Curated annotation (Swiss-Prot):
Name of the protein in question: Putative uncharacterized protein FLJ42384
Organism: Homo sapiens
Length: 140
C-alpha cells in the first residue's frame, strides 16, 4: 500500500499492540525509539503497519528499519485506536488520558517540530503524503 520504506533514526526498542476498530484488526510490531533524543516519543506516536507488507520480523526490523508503515498522531479518539504497551518492555509511562483523546494544537506543533519534521522530507513528501501535521504545506 505504501511505496516507501520508513528508515527510523531511532533505536529505543519497545513492542506494542494496537487495535483499530476502524480497520478491524489487531497487530503487533517492534518499533525503535531513541528516548534520549526524543523523550516521551512513545507517548505521542504509533506506527500503523500493514501486516500483509511487513509480515514477520526480519533482518530489516532487527537493524532498526521498518517496512510499510506510516507515522500518525496518537491523538485520535480512543474508540478508534487504543495503544497497549507491554509492561515488561515499557521504558516510559503510557500516554496520559488526555493524549489518548485528541492532542491540542500546541501539543501537535511541539511534536511536529521535534519528531515529525526530521522525517517529513524523507517519508511524507517523497510519498506525496502530508499526514503528520494539519498545517504543513511541505508536500504541496
Amino acid at each position: 500500500m505504501w511505496p516507501f520504506r520508513l528508515r527510523c533514526p531511532i533505536y529505543f526498542k519497545t513492542r506494542l499492540l494496537y487495535s483499530s476498530s476502524q480497520d478491524g484488526f489487531l497487530s503487533s510490531s517492534t518499533n525503535y525509539y531513541n528516548h534520549r533524543t526524543y523523550p516521551g516519543l512513545v507517548n505521542w506516536l504509533f506506527v500503523l503497519t500493514e501486516p500483509e507488507l511487513t509480515g514477520e520480523l526480519g533482518d530489516d526490523d532487527r537493524k532498526g528499519m521498518h517496512t510499510g508503515g506510516i507515522i500518525r498522531w496518537l491523538g485520535r479518539p480512543s474508540s478508534q485506536l487504543k495503544p497497549i504497551f507491554h509492561a515488561e518492555e515499557r521504558r516510559v509511562p503510557p500516554p496520559p488520558e488526555r493524549l489518548v483523546g485528541r492532542a491540542s494544537p500546541r501539543e501537535q506543533a511541539t511534536v511536529f517540530k521535534r519528531i515529525c519534521a526530521p522525517l517529513h522530507a524523507e517519508v511524507f513528501c517523497r510519498a506525496g503524503l502530508c499526514a503528520c501535521h494539519p498545517d504543513c504545506t511541505a508536500a504541496g
